């Protein structure tokens, strides 16, 4: 990301602070050069619209027309879900280098806030352990907590804010007021290839219906785009609910929270299909929410 920022006018690289173990907490801001040149003004608009008291409806509409939405994307809060950070780098490279009209339109109409790893400490621990034990009988998932204090439960800290990494993410929310947050995860390897919203029941009754509807609209748009591109294994309204307040900070502050769960690999080892190499992996029967 640092190299892309050096060579492209579409990316700004920033280290927002340090993590529990002293690693950098990175934010990449990606948009058109024109949007990045007026980033302060776009952030000012977001703050005005985030708290519109004193704005007339006409003023609010004018600000919305002048501004562009901010989309906050973060990956690998769970450090054994290694594919997402790798994907972030690929996405950033495409947005920095692709000269197609499609990418130009995206960059003109959105500011993407990218945190490549929400738990950099765990990523270092998991990756170093894999390399240290590669080709030995001890090669397996990192055997200890991959966050020093919270382990896998670091994404249940969005209402207590006990950890440095959570507070660094909250600072991004406070500074930029993004319209959408997207949390990238990985799930089991034998089911669907990707989960997108809408979520299954139960739903937290404290979430405003317009936000649950916004999540559903964005998720279904993602599913439709994937299916139209010939991608198989998309599931929605399944597995993941919207109940616990432990991860609802974004929704309690007026943003749809998009969760994606991608089928897992075995870290950097080959994933062998237990049904046989020539057999499909995962369920093959269509359902209304698994076309």
Name each model-derived stretch.
Residues 31-34, 42-77, 82-217, 224:
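Active-site/substrate-binding loop(s) of hydrolase catalytic cores
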Residues 1-35, 40-44:
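A non-catalytic alpha/beta surface segment that caps or lines the substrate-entry region
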Residues 16, 30-31, 117, 157, ...:
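Structured loops at beta-to-helix junctions and adjacent beta-edge loops in soluble globular domains
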Residues 10-17, 101-105, 233-238:
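Surface-exposed patches in mature extracellular/periplasmic domains of secreted proteins
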Residues 14, 26, 58-62, 245-251:
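Short, surface-exposed beta-strand/loop micro-motifs that present aromatic residues
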Residues 162-168, 172-291:
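C-terminal accessory segments enriched in acidic
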Residues 21-27, 123-126, 244-247:
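Short, solvent-exposed polar/charged micro-motifs at secondary-structure junctions
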Residues 8-11, 23-25, 67-70, 108-113, ...:
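Loop/turn elements at helix/coil->beta-strand transitions in domains of secreted/extracellular proteins
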